[in-house]
Amino acid sequence: MTFEPRRICRELNAHGVRYVLVGGFAAALHGSPLPTDDVDIVPARDADNLDRLGAALTALGARIRTGGEPVQTRIDGAFLAAMPFMLNLTTPFGDLDLTFRPA
């Protein structure tokens, strides 16, 4: 897997997903020299946005990241709405962490 964070963000943007970029990649865009190996976002929680996010994740080939093999499942708006806090995903372009209720 090659880490292509801009490819992940382009797909989210192409689907009209409203989100805030946070974490290490956001810091790198602001000049931080610290390395990062994932993209962290906080998506807007309205149903339409979660539907668009689900479509973007499908287009990215996102799977649920686990301690072992990633789990393939249907990730749609209803699935995302049921997530209480966080969802860790992997894509062919790198890992993507969704935070639904940031601290």
Functional labels for PLM-detected ranges:
Residues 1-103:
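Compositionally biased terminal segments of proteins
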